Amino acid sequence: MEIIKNYNEKELTLAIEGRIDTITSQELDKEINAESGNFDSLIMDLSDLEYISSAGLRVLIATQKKLKSYDIPFVIKNVNDTVGEIFRMSGFDKILKIE
């Protein structure tokens, strides 16, 4: 997994490439936590994400919950068909804000 960070003022976009699995989900969680306090909104661009495991889904839900408690918008964008199917099958497409 590769995480590419891009700031536009106080809006952080994280472009995730590769796979989010049990091991890499911990890296993603650490990266989000390391950047917290530096952004007013978070966009996660998943256009180059190949796969996400249940551990990765947990990171997304935990991130949404934490950011919501601070009224910080969290949006997931550019979900491909493979990852979109995982979101639909798990019901996460109804929980997460996906554009």
Summary of predicted features, one role per range:
Residues M1-A15:
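Short beta-strand/loop segment at the start of cytosolic alpha/beta domains
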Residues T22-I95:
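Amphipathic alpha-helical interaction surfaces in cytosolic regulatory modules
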